[in-house]
Regions:
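Alpha/beta-hydrolase superfamily serine-hydrolase fold, recognizing
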Residues: 50-52, 56-235
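A glycine/proline-hinged amphipathic helix-loop "lid/cap" segment
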Residues: 1-66
Length: 235
């Protein structure tokens, strides 16, 4: 049974966000809409130390104080359908994650479509992962997490890291990850009306924005079709 808070959020998304994803929509319009919604929902300063950092040119933010005060590191890849970033919402979420887990959270701002289509964001996420490895963060507890598009990018990052013989995280947490851009499973259609956020129009549009002309069965786009052998424990 969904909690009262979950039911409220689902209704809010169904009435404010889902109608925006319609045929012929403009990504700039969606960004303006989500920015207005974010401004209404998130107010007040964060009650946690933050630090802006460049990951070899990729902007990112640390959430949490000095490394010595934390039990480990969490690399979080934000969602947003590969074309949106809600910095205030994800800053708040990263702060909560740091507080609850005792880990220092790194939130990179990977490049977004349509200005930077696939594989730009995929490459940025692996670069952020390598940046942490190069600085020894894997020597302590180390986790990877992401939601929606960020969940997909988390899976892809681990698959690429494994194939490159890089150390893998201790575990990964995937929140509603997008794993199949082909939408070939029957449930993708018959559950479309139940989805509180994305309409069938969005499911058809977003791959054309993110990866135009690409084979959607490519595991870097649809990790469902990739090799999951050797990945760390997933939640």
């Amino acid at each position: 049974m969904p909690s009262l808070r979950a039911r409220f959020v689902n209704r809010l998304l169904r009435t404010t966000t889902k109608p925006v994803w319609r045929p012929g929509l403009d990504i700039a319009e969606v960004r303006r809409h989500t920015a207005r919604m974010e401004a209404r929902l998130v107010r007040g300063p964060l009650s946690i130390a933050t630090e802006a950092v460049s990951l070899d040119g990729i902007p990112a933010t640390w959430f949490g104080g000095p490394e010595r005060e934390h039990t480990g590191t969490l690399l979080y890849l934000h969602g947003g359908a590969w074309c949106l970033h809600l910095p205030k919402i994800y800053a708040r979420f990263a702060a909560i994650l740091s507080h609850l887990t005792g880990m220092r959270v790194l939130l990179p701002e990977y490049r977004l479509a349509p200005e930077h289509p696939f594989p730009a964001g995929v490459d940025d996420c692996l670069a952020a992962y390598r940046w942490l490895l190069d600085r020894g963060y894997r020597e302590r507890p180390f986790a990877l997490a992401g939601d929606s598009a960020g969940g997909s990018l988390s899976l892809v990052t681990m698959m690429r890291a494994r194939d490159a013989m890089l150390p893998l995280p201790d575990c990964a947490v995937l929140l509603s990850p997008s794993t199949d851009l082909t939408m070939s499973a029957p449930s993708a259609r018959y559950n479309a009306q139940l989805d509180p956020m994305f309409s069938p129009a969005a499911q058809d549009l977003l791959p054309n924005v993110y990866c135009p002309g690409q084979d959607r069965r490519n595991p870097l786009l649809s990790p469902l079709f990739g090799n999951w052998n050797g990945l760390p424990p997933l939640l």
